[in-house]
Amino acid sequence: GGSTYKIAIVLYVLKDSPAEEAGLKRGDWILGVIGSLGSIQDYDVLRSGGSVSLQLGKEIGNTKGFVSTRRVTLNASRTVEDTPFLKDSVYTYGNKRIGYLMYNHFASGPDEYDYSDTSYNLYLQQLFEKFKSRNVNEFVLDLRYNGGGLVNCAQLLASLLVRENVLGEPLCIMEYNDKNSNKNETLPLLKTTEVMAGNLNLQRLFVLTGSTTASASELII
């Protein structure tokens, strides 16, 4: 007999975005719009692009209830670069040097339709060279919000993660139905000469996944 209403949770915040400027953080609950608790009747109100006032809150223990905490004003949306690299870190635990990368989509550059732009791929290689220079020997790859993208980006990422002695070997077989069987191909891991500067020669890999992990992400897993 209790009332029900829609709420939303912040999964992550892009750098230099209106959400970051407003102080939104991962894990914040949006309880209402224009300061009215439970006013999210349609999620499109959060996608409208206009300036809105949000009522934020937090969970109350294990009661499945929420309490309001603060109100923030979110400025009108504007274009910001949605890079695949949300967070990268290196943690030391005993004799372990643990690399962490949250990689949110497989794209070679900012323009998903311009395959000639490989600036993201170049950055990925440089990032792994940094991991290697810091003697990373364990790795956590966070693909919880990665819905896929370009297969050649997955090919590069896999080549940077695998054991050195399997570089150049088959990564996957791309097999089409009988109408396009002429497109079937075996996609190999890149050669040692192409990724040696950043290949971590890992013996194992920890992958974080979620309900939206799909497509090219599954190739890595």
Model-found features: residue ranges?
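P-loop NTPase catalytic core of nucleic-acid-dependent motor ATPases
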Residues: 141
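Residue-level signal for short, function-critical loop segments
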Residues: 104, 145, 210-212
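Residue-level signal for short segments within beta-strands and strand-turn junctions
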Residues: 56-58, 209, 219
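Alpha-helix initiation/capping motif
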Residues: 36-42, 150, 177, 215
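Flexible, low-complexity junctional segments that flank or bridge functional domains
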Residues: 1-138
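Stable alpha-helical elements in mature extracytoplasmic
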Residues: 23-26, 120-127, 150-157, 216-220
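Gly/Ser/Thr-rich loop/hinge elements
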Residues: 148-206, 212
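Short, well-ordered, mixed-charge alpha-helical segments that flank or form enzyme active sites
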Residues: 17, 109-110, 148-150, 215-216
